[in-house]
Amino acid sequence: MSRQVVRSSKFRHVFGQPAKADQCYEDVRVSQTTWDSGFCAVNPKFMALICEASGGGAFLVLPLGKTGRVDKNVPLVCGHTAPVLDIAWCPHNDNVIASGSEDCTVMVWEIPDGGLVLPLREPVVTLEGHTKRVGIVAWHPTAQNVLLSAGCDNVILVWDVGTGAAVLTLGPDVHPDTIYSVDWSRDGALICTSCRDKRVRVIEPRKGTVVAEKERPHEGTRPVHAVFVSEGKILTTGFSRMSERQVALWDTKHLEEPLSLQELDTSSGVLLPFFDPDTNIVYLCGKGDSSIRYFEITSEAPFLHYLSMFSSKESQRGMGYMPKRGLEVNKCEIARFYKLHERKCEPIAMTVPRKSDLFQEDLYPPTAGPDPALTAEEWLSGRDAGPLLISLKDGYVPPKSRELRVNRGLDSARRRATPEPSSTLSSDTVSRLEEDVRNLNAIVQKLQERLDRLEETVQAK
């Protein structure tokens, strides 16, 4: 009888640990809109989630440590006139977040360090160029102020947020149908897209050229999602002809056959992939699922190795993924997800069991830091650069907020002027405004009491 050889991996025993009740965000109203995005975005400072709101689209932003029950009157980011479909934090400024909406606009917002004290209605800049709803927003990983948006008009626009102008356009000639997913390569030289026309494309956005294309990576009719992984490969999730969910790994230079194709189950939810380039682990989270599967990608066959699955009782309505610099390295945490329930956001820590409390260098290689490697102008001129790396050995402390400056130049004449955002007010100004509000409330209370006394006098006569 031959012995089965088990592949050695330091991630074989990774396990998921949900946060305790007091470390969750309770009593939040998660959006009911049907759309295949995560509906949640997190960074080392803030947690943001798309929520139900009357009279337009809104999302909630809370300081990361402000857990527990969320007040029903908590101020929201509420400048959109229709439901918000996607949100994304800027990788180079933890106070800046972009949102795409059914109102056909992209808005970029600046959140003060302590969070919002008043509703935020005016964005730093509104980016107008799509003719149908905007379902995807994605920041360039290494170039400052470069933002991509994809709309249901089958158009991808790349914006220079610093000027408020669209600098690149990929029109319906590239994607003739709805775009399901867009992902930047690690150095931002390429994008990978999946489309309703059943094709996955690798595109050089500055030239507008498709450098690789795969027709029907999965035989089913349900949406496909695609992300870049290590060494020029892409990973796709989709469905078989028999509606079984699948995950596949592809070499972009040889797309004829997948390097690996695995069937998972027969659930109907679209699988959202999250890839960690530091560990080469990809996590698969399905909306409507109650589990997170994770796989390790290696450079030798069979390339894609199933590790394990975290399961819970309640299904997820969305999922946020924390950047590596927001993790607790002293607890050997290699990933953290923010699972959206119907009325709650629950952090889930993915941990490698280790006996020592010392920094584990093999788990934490230098990771992408918060500083951009390029300006928007440098990237547009043809330069590419990988992320500027930082060590997490001594922990990571988020820097104080850096103001986002927008210089519209000649473009301002044809776009609506954007007033100074309330989020840039100083703490002294905010304190004065809060005091004014309290004084006004006191005056209103006194007037109400006076009115009540007058009514009693009139009734007595």
From Swiss-Prot:
Residues 425-461 form a coiled coil. The gene is Coro1a. This is Coronin-1A. It comes from Rattus norvegicus (Rat). The modification Phosphothreonine is found at residue 418. GO terms for molecular function: actin binding; actin filament binding; actin monomer binding; cytoskeletal protein binding; identical protein binding; myosin heavy chain binding; phosphatidylinositol 3-kinase binding; protein homodimerization activity. Residues 420-430 have a biased composition (Polar residues). GO terms for biological process: actin cytoskeleton organization; actin filament organization; calcium ion transport; cell migration; cell-substrate adhesion; cellular response to interleukin-4; early endosome to recycling endosome transport; epithelial cell migration. Belongs to the WD repeat coronin family. phosphorylation at Ser-412 by PKC strongly down-regulates the association with actin.
